[in-house]
Amino acid sequence: MNLTYNQFEILVAIEQRQNEKLTQRTLAKQTYVSLGIVNKVMEELSDLELITLKNNSTYELTLKGYEWLEPHRVKRAIFIAAGFGSRLVPITLNTPKPLIRVHGKLIIETLLDAVIDAGIKDITIVRGYLADQFDVLLKKYPMIKFITNPIYNESNNISSLMQVKDNLENAYVLESDLLLSNPRIIRKYEYTSNYLGIKMDVTDDWCFTLKKGIISKMSVGGENVFQMVGISYWNKEDGKKLATHIEKVFKKPGGKECYWDEVACKDYISDYKVMVRQCDKEDIVEIDTFNELKQIDKVYDI
């Protein structure tokens, strides 16, 4: 029951599009591999009896296909939503950034809807600034659990991860202020620990350098890198390690000022093999400033 990475990615892509006519070109675009690899892997999946062709280029997973994916199921989602969002003043003076409406929908809703559509029911939101306002989400999402970060305003986001450090196995960790346009990037299954990233020739933002597909460096700015997107997944083994490592970093001098992402991708990078899962810049947007918000939703341009 051991799938290669390419077999897994194409199997998941087919599972997401089972009722659609599906060309190999579509699969190549979604999985960021060549047509030749898609053709080869499709033959392998067919030979393994993991997929079957229904008609008119419509594929579906067999029972065996689902059984092979099951060990990779995502079990929970952790939302980090405690911060103030100072760069979006004045609107964040009265509203937490994840609860800002864009085109009539709360930013965090774009993520929550995708998580729920992926069958993930164990959902925790770590809140802090104007915490009670998040209760509005319970009407639509009664399954949500809230944890309050009491020191959000005197520490960096590692303090939010301290609140949930024992719940990171088989878990997505999501920044809650990302406006999601492509819900398919939130999936029922993940192959191994990974960060979402956008391939860039050059960026001045947080980014990853890769070595043989594994994150070898995390930095601010770089060339031929993947710009970091604030959605990651942690498998069972890495989730356990993170619980220990987050606490160690948090308790060291100056540890409260750290970004939690630095724990696995900088401080203890040799203990992890974290991949980058590629996405496009059109898939997801972080609205950093009030001017950017006005450009995206003209209702604020007054």
PLM regions: where:
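Conserved beta-loop-beta/alpha segment of the NTase-like Rossmann-fold superfamily
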Residues: 135-206
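A short, conserved structural fragment
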Residues: 46-56
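N-terminal glycine-rich phosphate-binding loop and ensuing alpha1 helix
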Residues: 14, 71-131
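Short amphipathic alpha-helical interaction segments
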Residues: 32-44
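Short amphipathic alpha-helical interface segments
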Residues: 2-22
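Conserved core of the sugar-phosphate nucleotidyltransferase
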Residues: 182-254
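Short, cationic-aromatic polyanion-contact patches
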Residues: 3-6, 23, 55-72
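Conserved alpha/beta core of the MobA/IspD/sugar-nucleotide pyrophosphorylase nucleotidyltransferase superfamily
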Residues: 66-77, 228-302
